[in-house]
Amino acid sequence: MFETLINNISKSIVGNKEKIKLALAAIISEGSILIEDNPGSGKTTLAKTITLNLGLNFKRVQFTSDLLPSDILGFNILQNDKLTFQKGPIFTNIVLADELNRGSPKSQSAFLEAMEEKNAVSYTHLTLPTKALV
């Protein structure tokens, strides 16, 4: 089954079986991975293809200097005299953080904390979905 999955993903990602195996190992172990590579090398395609093959959800966060922690984690909205939490993109199975080094220290810290602790803090602790790969 594992080899079939690798072969299916390899149809979209040519020549990167080692990256595919490492990414799948991270998903199985509910860990995280850091892929540093040149632009256009297929990092986003790899994440999307794995997501499709496993039937998971995918979100992408583009880190910029003006990105706020609430843009990643979510925020409270006042609706009908009641605070409702609007979940951010971190609340998905696979999150691709693009240009993480360009984010502000607060945004990086919020993202890395959620990644490590598998929860986000917004007045209460909210648990991230299982099989969350960041």
Regions found by a protein language model. Give the residues of each.
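Pre-Walker A (pre-P-loop) alpha-helix and adjacent loop at the N terminus of AAA/AAA+ ATPase modules
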Residues: 2-32, 38
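Short loop/turn elements that form and flank the Walker-type P-loop nucleotide-binding site
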Residues: 21, 28-30, 54, 89-92, ...
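Walker A/P-loop
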Residues: 28-63
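AAA+/P-loop NTPase substrate/partner-engagement loops
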Residues: 57-78
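Conserved alpha-helical scaffold flanking the Walker A/P-loop in AAA+ ATPase domains
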Residues: 78-95
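Conserved AAA+/SF3 P-loop NTPase catalytic/coupling segment centered on the Walker-B
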Residues: 92-116
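Conserved small/polar residues in nucleotide/adenosyl-binding loops
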Residues: 124-130
